[in-house]
């Protein structure tokens, strides 16, 4: 916990500094509160991190650069930084004693959870390894040829890579938990000082027991949830009289969400609506909007082309115009992203092709205990929220949020209908009901009760084998005494690794029998041998070095002759 606390302090100073840099870089006078200033710093750092990753990894050179920029901004904005910190301290001192105690409890619970071991399959499949590749090489040419999931390299992983401090002996994985703590601090302070329909974020502490399960690993889903909460907060607060500065901030946040994960596409409903409402849009306004869009789209396409060879990954649109050696072969791309494989998490390809729509719907609904809870919640909210809006909040802004929700569900239905890609809407609608229908004293009691649930899950972690349908399960993350000082490892896989040669590629593979897609935490390049031999046997492809003697030159998929396959 102590080591994590030190990393949190550095993250705070960096985001604070880059918030000022973001205002300067995007040339806008954002009227933002203390929390959104730090979120602006986060997306500014993510933007700069993407630019850096085109040329190098987040190694010692980057951290010298980051330290230099931090020192420079701290000198230039030293007065503003001092005022910022004083304002935060004054706000904390001003709140009531019971709120201070609650805030202190939340602080230690989030810190303890952050120092614990994370146990998620996606973390073992590609989160850990994606961050390691970013640390070592930045955006790596043809990385998707080694593991199809690496094509998803997220902006959230870029950020976590920056703060993983790979040159140390510790396993840092704490950005998500730190951002959750910031949101909680804002919520508790605002809970007493301001109370209005636009301040939905004050209800956030009641969701800590769920949100912490997203932050214990570097899940891009938490990045989407965080940005979504901020965007809806700004949208409701400024809907009646939007200005170009607020619109531009919401637009930046929406673009940033797309760099994190394409499931953030539903966010674009909000800037589109505000764009229509803003009057007197100047030529300068349109040029700024267009140039910002081109920069972000260019970064997104460039990253995709380097890693997978598909400009609009996870779509294969226009990929035929890019005849590049390191492009993931179409057969492997289709294996991972064709419709029956996108539904594989709840049905086999045969079931997708043979079952009726109702039978598929039922399998999706009842896939597991946790899926059943969230899937039923999504369906209920589709039916209940319109009635709630009509009865209590019959205003256009709330209907637009619901429209975004329906659009997101339609998008997921034709791509990958997993509840976690729409869970942000469950959170925001739950917060609306919580804020508008629960009394202030009852709110505080629920805040406190929610932290008891967090404490219980720290001491007795969720056993996902009891609520999940996945055939492979990891040991639950348990807080240990040594975690008071040192953070737990990033990986739950306790396996030795052996070196295997396949053609000109030398790779590490776990000796222990692990999940088909999982790699764990080991030296690069790392690949589950079962996975390699599966694609070799069924598709006649193996990953190979572009340059026989230099891994840094990239990877491609080599087509084998059937007679050479053993």
Q: Could you describe each region identified by the protein language model?
A:
Residues 1-89:
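Membrane-embedded, hydrophobic transmembrane alpha-helices
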Residues 17-24, 177-193, 353-395:
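Hydrophobic, aromatic-rich transmembrane alpha-helices
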Residues 48-53, 212-213, 246-273, 292-295, ...:
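Membrane-interface alpha helices of multi-pass inner-membrane proteins
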Residues 96-109, 278-305, 449-455:
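Hydrophobic alpha-helical membrane-interfacial segments at the cytosolic entry of transmembrane helices
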Residues 110-196, 215-217:
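Active-site lumenal/periplasmic loops and adjacent helix-entry segments of GT-C-fold
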Residues 115-118, 287-364:
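Membrane-lumen/periplasm interface segments of specific transmembrane helices
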Residues 245-253, 289-294, 440-473:
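Signature aromatic-anchored transmembrane alpha helix within multi-pass, membrane-resident enzymes
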Residues 321-348, 450-566:
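Intrinsically disordered, polar/acidic, low-complexity terminal segments
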């Amino acid at each position: 916990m102590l080591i994590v606390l030190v990393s949190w302090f550095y993250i705070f100073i960096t985001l604070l500094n880059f918030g000022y840099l973001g205002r300067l870089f995007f040339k806008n006078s954002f009227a933002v509160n203390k929390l959104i200033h730090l979120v602006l710093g986060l997306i500014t750092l993510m933007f700069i991190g993407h630019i850096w990753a085109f040329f190098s990894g987040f190694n010692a050179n980057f951290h010298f650069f980051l330290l230099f920029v931090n020192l420079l901004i701290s000198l230039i904005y030293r007065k503003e930084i001092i005022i910022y910190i004083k304002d935060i301290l004054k706000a904390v001192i001003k709140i009531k004693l019971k709120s201070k105690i609650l805030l202190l409890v939340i602080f230690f619970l989030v810190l303890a959870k952050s120092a614990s071991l994370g146990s998620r399959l996606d973390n073992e499949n590609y989160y850990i390894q994606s961050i390691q590749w970013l640390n070592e090489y930045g955006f790596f040419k043809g990385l998707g040829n080694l593991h199809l999931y690496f094509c998803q390299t997220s902006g959230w992983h870029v950020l976590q890579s920056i703060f993983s401090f790979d040159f140390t002996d510790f396993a840092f994985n704490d950005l998500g938990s730190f951002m959750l703590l910031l949101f909680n601090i804002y919520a508790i302070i605002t809970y007493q000082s301001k109370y209005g329909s636009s301040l939905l974020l004050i209800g956030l502490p009641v969701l800590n027991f769920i949100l912490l399960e997203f932050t214990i690993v570097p899940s891009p889903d938490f990045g989407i949830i965080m940005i979504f909460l901020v965007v809806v907060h700004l949208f409701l607060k400024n809907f009646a009289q939007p200005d170009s500065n607020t619109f531009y901030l919401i637009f930046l946040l929406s673009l940033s969400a797309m760099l994190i994960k394409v499931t953030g596409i539903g966010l674009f409903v909000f800037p589109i609506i505000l764009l229509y409402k803003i009057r007197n849009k100047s030529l300068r306004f349109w040029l700024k909007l267009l140039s910002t869009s081109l920069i972000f789209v260019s970064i997104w396409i460039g990253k995709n082309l380097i890693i997978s060879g598909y400009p609009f990954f996870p779509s294969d649109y226009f990929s035929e115009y890019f005849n590049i050696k390191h492009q993931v072969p179409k057969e492997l791309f289709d294996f991972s992203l064709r419709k029956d494989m996108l539904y594989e998490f709840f049905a086999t390809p045969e079931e997708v092709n043979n079952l009726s729509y109702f039978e598929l719907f039922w399998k999706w609904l009842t896939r597991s205990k946790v899926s059943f809870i969230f899937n039923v919640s999504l369906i209920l909210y589709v039916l209940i929220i319109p009635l709630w809006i009509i009865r209590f909040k019959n205003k256009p802004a709330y209907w637009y949020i619901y429209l975004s929700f329906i659009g997101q569900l339609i998008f997921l239905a034709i791509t990958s209908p997993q509840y976690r890609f729409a869970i942000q809407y469950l959170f925001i609608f739950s917060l609306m009901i919580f804020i508008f229908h629960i009394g202030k004293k009852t709110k505080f009691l629920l805040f406190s009760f929610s932290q008891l649930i967090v404490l219980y899950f720290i001491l007795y972690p969720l056993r996902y084998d009891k609520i999940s349908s996945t055939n492979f399960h990891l040991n639950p993350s348990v807080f240990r005494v040594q975690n008071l000082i040192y953070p737990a490892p990033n990986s739950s896989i306790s396996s030795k690794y052996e070196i295997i040669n396949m053609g000109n590629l030398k790779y590490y593979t776990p000796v222990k029998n692990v999940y088909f897609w999982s790699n764990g935490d080991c030296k690069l390049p790392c690949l589950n041998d079962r996975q390699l031999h599966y694609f070799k046997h069924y598709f006649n492809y193996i990953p190979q070095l572009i340059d026989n003697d230099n891994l840094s030159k990239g990877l491609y998929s080599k087509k084998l002759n059937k007679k050479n396959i053993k």
